[in-house]
């Protein structure tokens, strides 16, 4: 049979293609018609219904498959997290817990507070299940007549309500209002600093050199136009980083006859002393003017080391001194970017460069530190340098005019923050400071929580020591009154004392108390909106860290315990305020340094030829080399931090109490803050210490 030709089939095929069809009519009264889509009337309805039903079934199956996969992934992540926690805790040594020493007063107070909170929570739970829901109403109705008293336990509970409302709530309200005022004042100060930084960026304000100094074509000459520069590298048992810091300093682009490097080694380990001495000898043989100094009597920590080095007779021939800690790696043009700022500025005493971190992305702890330090350098140091010509010397990556050091009294051993001490005394003597935000020096941040905690304790106890010692000198100095007010009110009180005081008191003491005393409940904007806004301001200098805003906020509240304890120790001269512990380094290098080192070793090995050596001696040498290459296995340990753990249980207890009172925001804040304290207390953040 011949195939049947149907115009309807042809029309259906053309309409399925979706090709636009334009029909033109000769009569101008007709308009142009454009057909875009096929007519739905030609589509078979029964088949589409069957097809849609199958599609729905397949969609449901796909969604179920995705849900199962998601649950499997969550379970895998959860079990892997538990496994890593178990492995970390398995390394906890019986003696690896935190030593409280004379600072155990804070831990004892937290324990007492925790026991009282657990007792009150148990009492509240009994009352809750008995149906005494008085605490759900902020305006509590306390039974007064004997007819309303149901039992002896009910009588005790009513007595607790009366005691709470009449005697406990009023002082807590007063303290919370005081802390909220301090919180708002500090927030305004932080906001003003950010506005000042934006103004500097908008106006492109920065210290500039008037002309090009020390041209490269004059470098091969006598170098008489180059000032004499002394470079000091203080170190103490810095096995991991001594080599890269000495190497970087010895490659500074400066005439050799105008530069002297002092390696100030305070190590008490003879093997480390020998390593550093060999490194100095190696660079000395290459023509670098470098000296190794080791003190037999190690007093005064870093300040004593620097003071001893400045007492050498040959220092009188030098005009400037650059200081680098053992983990700092300056670029070769560092001196050419900093020293020219001193020319024709006799009042300038210090040029400070910015820190850059080679290990900022190593773990969560280093990322959170990077947020804080970026704000410190980008905002605080830059704004104070531009508008006040004064800021706290960071202790390293800076160049001092030696005359300014001498007129200010030199390095003193009275505190553990000798850098801030010399900066304040130089400011009182009228010297000005310059901060260079675009000159960066590579360094490390602590990768373990233990090292970071010790560093922060020293950084926050020292300023309080210094404040006690310098207050009279500030009041009797000849500087302007507004400079005295800035030093006392802003530099010391607001940013060094008030900040750790209110952050710990408000979020770690008052907030959990108010869960058991609902008459003094904190408003939501205090615990949620304002802290998030301030965290956003802190993250602005490091925009890539924006995903870590919530961990940053929680971790900063966790660190308030250490900072508050350090502040009190320094203010009242407790034992730990005089403790100096060298921050543990990992010895990280930049990627370019690692690549250069790899190339150097690969070129060195094939060209090594040993002559005049027998086969047996070659075998012994190879065995010794293999032993040197084998890494020394050092067991890493976890530490238990008692104060953080006690506060974790306290906040979680308060979270349970807030759950009974149906306080949503307070519950979630206390829950996540308590879990953060728990993770930190178990040393589950950062690397483990070896």
From Swiss-Prot:
Disruption phenotype: Normal xyloglucan (XyG) levels. Plants missing several xyloglucan synthases (e.g. CSLC4, CSLC5, CSLC6, CSLC8 and CSLC12) have no detectable XyG levels and several associated phenotypes including reduced stems height and leaves area, as well as shorter root hairs and reduced pollen tube formation ability.
InterPro entries the UniProt entry points to: Glyco_trans_2-like (IPR001173), Nucleotide-diphossugar_trans (IPR029044)
Transmembrane segments: 106-126, 180-200, 497-517, 522-542, 640-660, 665-685
Family: Belongs to the glycosyltransferase 2 family. Plant cellulose synthase-like C subfamily.
GO biological process: cell wall organization; plant organ development; pollen tube development
Gene: CSLC8
Residue positions, PTM Phosphoserine: 614
Cellular location(s): Golgi apparatus membrane
PANTHER family: GLUCOMANNAN 4-BETA-MANNOSYLTRANSFERASE 9, XYLOGLUCAN GLYCOSYLTRANSFERASE 8-RELATED
Enzyme Commission number: 2.4.1.-
Leader sequence residues: none
Tissues and organs where the protein is expressed, per its UniProt entry: Mainly expressed in flowers and seeds, and, at very low levels, in seedlings, roots, leaves and stems.
UniProt organism field: Arabidopsis thaliana (Mouse-ear cress)
Annotated residues for binding of substrate: 325, 327
Record's bilayer topology term: Multi-pass membrane protein
The protein's name in its UniProt record: Probable xyloglucan glycosyltransferase 8
Record lineage: Eukaryota, Viridiplantae, Streptophyta, Embryophyta, Tracheophyta
Function according to Swiss-Prot or TrEMBL: Probable beta-1,4-glucan synthase rather involved in the synthesis of the xyloglucan backbone than cellulose. Seems to work simultaneously with xyloglucan 6-xylosyltransferase. Xyloglucan is a noncellulosic polysaccharides of plant cell wall and consists of a glucan backbone substituted by xylose, galactose and fucose.
